[in-house]
Amino acid sequence: MSLNLVSEQLLAANGLKHQDLFAILGQLAERRLDYGDLYFQSSYHESWVLEDRIIKDGSYNIDQGVGVRAISGEKTGFAYADQISLLALEQSAQAARTIVRDSGDGKVQTLGAVEHSPLYTSVDPLQSMSREEKLDILRRVDKVAREADKRVQEVTASLSGVYELILVAATDGTLAADVRPLVRLSVSVLVEEDGKRERGASGGGGRFGYEFFLADLDGEVRADAWAKEAVRMALVNLSAVAAPAGTMPVVLGAGWPGVLLHEAVGHGLEGDFNRRGTSVFSGQVGELVASELCTVVDDGTMVDRRGSVAIDDEGTPGQYNVLIENGILKGYMQDKLNARLMGMTPTGNGRRESYAHLPMPRMTNTYMLPGKSTPQEIIESVEYGIYAPNFGGGQVDITSGKFVFSTSEAYLIENGKVTKPVKGATLIGSGIETMQQISMVGNDLKLDNGVGVCGKEGQSLPVGVGQPTLKVDNLTVGGTA
């Protein structure tokens, strides 16, 4: 269904047919290439921002174009055009294939539709509500947050939606298309008491229409729940004391704290870093790289999730990839280029920000599978340490695996009980060492609410993260107490 719909909107509307794509791929193959592809994209994006009870910003953007890639060995020729036409395709193909002078046979495998499971709706979220209905969601969030506590001074809420159509045709016979909706709601609040100010934030989204935000979440409208959560987090930090410093046990909460796993481990398991030998995990397949309690997967096949892809941006169907199993490194996330050069199989992780960018190995939804311990058992096992259920930003060095992460919500654990909230706690360590220090894995796997944005080499993409509650026996905590 996607292929027919997208072909009509991206190709037929611009006077193109599948035969034209086959002919352009044939032009690429007139040089001695290992692979060539055409990537068509049309995206519609809107965003709205409410601040101080006023709609302060609204934007709408349409972008479409085509990227043409030619690969020979490790060399890549790439050209793109911000219009979709036969002339633009021909000129881009001419430019992309100039990396190779040797003649090829001009043969291309017959294009065949790639079969894949529908993982999300093909409804255009931008058309799923009127403008006033969208703005009413923001006004609702503002009202709920302010009514939640009189100490709330400022509320900022933003709503964004994307409707994206993509089509891929390649010299290996790939012909695939996808329709990708994506929505996100974010809320940030500022609370003040006795001259002391703190912020809290919440939100979420996924591959839905905007009605998702008005649906039920545990007996409450989802948008309302997130507004109250932002207020709760801000109030927690209002009463927080300075975090202790030193090496101690750290309990990481379920869900969004999986961002540490994403950064400190996930990036190091992307194929390009490992082919170049620049990852701490290079050459470690089959080796014990984590506690035997740890199984980590990257799963592009989750229904409606922010990071999911029915097909990746090279036309490979999204897959469920086991990266680490019982502590043993099983494999890397691959795109077509790095898979071919490493003698491996593409894993559905070839992703790109747009037609104007080259694809590379990227994560989809990366998470750790649940274990057998209850969260309560994990907390009770700690005499003195930190419980971190929410994270802020972080940085990681792919080569060494070293990371620094700041917590946005954290508590002291004393004598097996969560006691007072702390602020200013940063977690410092290295990916492999931290994974090997995991001594308990919870039975409460949770994925994030759908807010993840991953950056790599200047390209931003939607991703998902998750994990159960985890106990790390020894982690360096940077604090101010």
UniProtKB/Swiss-Prot annotation:
GO CC term, one of those recorded: cytosol
Keywords: Hydrolase, Metalloprotease, Protease
Record-linked Pfam families: PmbA_TldD_1st, PmbA_TldD_2nd, PmbA_TldD_3rd
EC number(s) given by UniProt: 3.4.-.-
SUPFAM superfamilies reported in the protein's UniProt record: Putative modulator of DNA gyrase, PmbA/TldD
Presence of the UniProt keyword Protein transport in the record: no
Keyword Protease in annotation: yes
InterPro entries: Metalloprtase-TldD/E_C, Metalloprtase-TldD/E_cen_dom, Metalloprtase-TldD/E_N, Peptidase_U62_metallo, TldD, TldD/PmbA_N, TldD/PmbA_sf
BP-aspect Gene Ontology terms: protein processing
Gene Ontology MF, one: metallopeptidase activity
EC class of the enzyme, as a word: hydrolase
Family statement drawn from the similarity comment of this UniProt entry: Belongs to the peptidase U62 family.
Miscellaneous field: In strains containing the pMccB17 plasmid, required for the maturation and secretion of the antibiotic bacteriocin microcin B17 (MccB17).
Role according to the record: Metalloprotease involved in CcdA degradation. Suppresses the inhibitory activity of the carbon storage regulator (CsrA).
Official protein name in the record: Metalloprotease TldD
Organism: Escherichia coli (strain K12)
